[in-house]
Design a protein with these regions (language model features):
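Short, flexible, solvent-exposed loop/turn segments with mixed acidic/basic and small polar residues
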Residues: 1, 29-41
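Short amphipathic alpha-helix segments
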Residues: 7-34
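Helix N-cap motif at beta-to-alpha junctions
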Residues: 8-12, 49-56
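Long, compositionally biased, intrinsically disordered regions
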Residues: 3-14, 68-72
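Short, low-order "capping/linker" segments at domain edges
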Residues: 78-98
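Conserved short beta-strand edge segments in small beta-sheet-based binding/regulatory domains
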Residues: 28-32, 64-83
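Long, non-globular segments of proteins
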Residues: 1-2, 13-17, 81-88
């Protein structure tokens, strides 16, 4: 399970709360600026992948400043995260060979 959150630029430091929380920090937590994902604006996006309890905890930690994305917007941003990961893996393969 995953959830994507959007944090306005003035709330970007709240992403650190996820990395400091015992439960959430044990999951996959990826933080990216909007521009690095090819999305306009100065927002910061956070992808949390893991167990349901950790996703719920992340939602609770970010409720005062972050917005959990839903529907096509969440899917679009999630795809941007995955595309970056795939590009990185592809680049490593070109460096080290098959």
């Amino acid at each position: 399970m995953y959830r994507v959150f959007r944090l306005p630029a003035n709330q970007a430091a709240k992403a650190d709360l996820l990395l400091q929380d015992d439960l959430v920090s044990r999951q996959s937590v990826v933080v990216r600026d909007a521009k690095s994902l090819g999305i306009g604006g100065d927002d910061r996006y956070v992808l949390v992948e893991g167990i349901d309890a950790a996703i719920a905890r992340a939602s609770e930690l970010l409720k005062d400043g972050g917005k959990a994305l839903t529907g096509t917007e969440a899917e679009r941003v999630y795809h941007s995260f995955r595309s970056q990961d795939e590009d990185a893996v592809s680049g490593m393969g070109m460096i080290f060979g098959p």
